[in-house]
């Protein structure tokens, strides 16, 4: 049984809640002692992991729609991508304002260049910014065939973002490895498409 347009609308509502509720939880945790002795790192890791979750969900949509024969699922991809960008922006903001501090924002550029894992992070964010700004139907019409080429760059983010996470942790734990493995698996599902590009 295929999903209807009405069911997709309700699914989008649920996905919006999935994007917004973690923010409410984070505010609650900040104000009610729900974070560890290093709350800045907790906020950075939470926002970064949430961005990664939405990135993986975005990458999951196409193969899921294809294998489950639910073409209307594609309509949720843009929404998931937007939430990925929102959480990636919160992640970047938490580093800039909480780690560096508002009085040291001038150091942000040098920090992003001098620390390789930060360089990967800002490249990923800039790509997400470009994809977000061109995610409208107007941009799709204006860019034509170039639109799909541009939005295929999301696969670069799928590589760089997990590496950024792996590189940023001082002690390797299962979480970043799991995210990297999931990203790799989702990229592997597109093996045939990549082969066509390389020919």
From Swiss-Prot:
GO MF terms held by the record: electron transfer activity; FMN binding; heme binding; metal ion binding; oxidoreductase activity, acting on diphenols and related substances as donors
Membrane topology annotation: Multi-pass membrane protein
Superkingdom in the source lineage: Bacteria
Annotated compartments: Cell inner membrane
Annotated TM spans: 10-30, 82-102, 116-136, 153-173
InterPro entries: Fe3_Rdtase_TM_dom (IPR013130), MsrQ-like (IPR022837)
Any GO CC annotation of this UniProt entry: plasma membrane
Swiss-Prot/TrEMBL cofactor(s): FMN; heme b
Pfam families, sorted: Ferric_reduct (PF01794)
Cofactor details (free text): Binds 1 FMN per subunit.
Main location group: membrane
Quaternary structure annotation from Swiss-Prot or TrEMBL: Heterodimer of a catalytic subunit (MsrP) and a heme-binding subunit (MsrQ).
Protein name: Protein-methionine-sulfoxide reductase heme-binding subunit MsrQ
Species this chain originates from: Salmonella enteritidis PT4 (strain P125109)
């Amino acid at each position: 049984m295929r999903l209807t347009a009405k069911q997709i609308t309700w699914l989008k509502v649920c996905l919006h809640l999935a994007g917004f509720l973690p923010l409410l939880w984070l505010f609650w945790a900040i104000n009610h002692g729900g974070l560890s002795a290093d709350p800045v790192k907790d906020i950075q890791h939470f926002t970064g992991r949430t961005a990664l979750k939405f990135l993986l969900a975005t990458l999951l949509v196409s193969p899921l729609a294809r294998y489950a024969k639910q073409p209307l699922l594609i309509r949720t991809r843009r929404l998931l991508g937007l939430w990925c960008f929102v959480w990636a922006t919160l992640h970047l903001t938490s580093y800039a304002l909480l780690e560096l501090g508002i009085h040291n924002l001038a150091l942000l550029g040098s920090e992003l260049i001098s620390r390789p894992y930060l360089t990967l992070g800002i490249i990923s964010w800039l790509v997400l910014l470009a994809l977000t700004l061109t995610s409208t139907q107007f941009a799709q019409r204006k860019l034509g065939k170039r639109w799909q080429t541009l939005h295929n760059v999301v696969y670069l983010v799928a590589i760089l973002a997990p590496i950024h996470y792996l590189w940023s942790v001082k002690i390797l734990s299962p979480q970043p490895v799991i995210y990297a493995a999931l990203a790799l698996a989702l990229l592997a599902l597109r093996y045939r498409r990549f082969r066509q590009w390389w020919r």
